[in-house]
């Protein structure tokens, strides 16, 4: 969170030192588009100019970013700063932070909105970090409804149900 909360700590000297340790990848934690300021843009630019690929790992937080329009603005804003939205984590049930927790359904709704209304580059993966060390599990909207011999039935991001060819090459469709 340092480039977000204390961006002036990102200096030329720091970037020169980090350059010596390639490959180096840095994931940041922006949670709301209001955190994208002139100072954080400058810090991200300095890190990216040093050849460091930047990603972002947001935490889905009630009242902070649990709105599809807020999350879209955040992810599009990050791309403009050369930061690739990487993960949105569902908040864990940690004592003292439970009031920030949302339902998983809200996260899936946000992901469906992002899928339909922004660039694929601005779509992170929604993740539940499973309890007891069971690992990161992606939470994906269900788009495949059924599999047939020659077609699959799918739901588009708009909710339209269509049949799609499920054959080898040389199949045309409208």
Residue ranges and their predicted role:
Residues 1-10, 18-39, 43, 53-62:
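Core AdoMet radical
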Residues 17, 46, 77-80, 113:
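Alpha-helical scaffold elements within enzyme catalytic domains, especially in hydrolases
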Residues 9, 66-68, 98-101:
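Short, solvent-exposed loop/turn segments at secondary-structure boundaries
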Residues 79-174:
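Auxiliary Fe-S-binding modules of radical SAM enzymes
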Residues 22-24, 50-53, 82-84, 122:
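Short, well-ordered coil/turn segments that N-cap beta-strands
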Residues 65-78:
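Catalytic cores of alpha/beta
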Residues 40-67, 157-174:
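Mobile, glycine- and charge-enriched loop segments
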Residues 11, 40, 71, 107:
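Aromatic/hydrophobic pocket-lining residues that form the small-molecule binding cavity
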């Amino acid at each position: 969170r340092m480039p977000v909360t204390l961006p002036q700590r990102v200096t030329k000297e720091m970037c020169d030192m980090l350059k010596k340790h390639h490959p180096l990848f840095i994931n940041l934690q922006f949670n709301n588009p209001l955190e994208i300021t002139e100072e954080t843009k400058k810090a991200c630019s300095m890190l990216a100019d040093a050849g460091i690929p930047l990603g972002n790992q947001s935490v889905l937080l009630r009242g902070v970013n649990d709105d599809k329009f807020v999350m879209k603005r955040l992810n599009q804003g990050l791309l403009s700063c050369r930061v690739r939205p990487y993960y949105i984590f569902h908040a864990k049930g940690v004592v003292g932070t439970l009031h920030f927790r949302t339902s998983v359904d809200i996260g899936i709704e946000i992901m469906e909105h992002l899928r339909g209304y922004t660039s694929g580059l601005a779509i992170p993966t929604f993740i539940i970090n499973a309890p007891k060390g069971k690992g990161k599990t992606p939470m994906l909207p269900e788009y495949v409804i059924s599999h047939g011999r020659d077609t699959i039935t799918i739901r588009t991001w708009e909710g339209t149900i269509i049949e799609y060819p499920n054959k080898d090459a040389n199949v045309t469709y409208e």
